[in-house]
UniProtKB/Swiss-Prot annotation:
It comes from Phytoplasma australiense. PANTHER family: 30S RIBOSOMAL PROTEIN S13/40S RIBOSOMAL PROTEIN S18, SMALL RIBOSOMAL SUBUNIT PROTEIN US13M. It comes from the Bacteria. Residues 98-121 are annotated as: Disordered. The keyword RNA-binding applies. Belongs to the universal ribosomal protein uS13 family. Part of the 30S ribosomal subunit. Forms a loose heterodimer with protein S19. Forms two bridges to the 50S subunit in the 70S ribosome. GO terms for biological process: translation. This is Small ribosomal subunit protein uS13.
Amino acid sequence: MARIAGIDIPSDKRVVIALTYIYGLGKKLSQKILNELNISHDIRVKNLTEQQLSSLRSEITKYSVEGDLRREVTLNIKRLMEIGVYRGLRHRKGLPVRGQKTRNNAHTVKGKPKSIAGKKK
């Protein structure tokens, strides 16, 4: 297994797919990186040379990935909550943020239904 950006990427997979194991790198961005470095998309990670791996590592450091990206996202959410905008309030209450209805199907965000004592149909 090759280690890139602090993540062990699987050696038996194609490079394009293996790079998507890094948080913040999707298929499109991994294709773009491989095109810039002139590395074939079909080559397996175990067949990469050490020079190709080092160039991949240096290219990926240019992007915000893994811990830095996760920290950036959480700080953005905290900032929204601090300034008191609508999106921040929805985050604080644990409700859908992007305008979805909550009467029926917001169970993923809201969590398990809470039973109300004394309420029967």
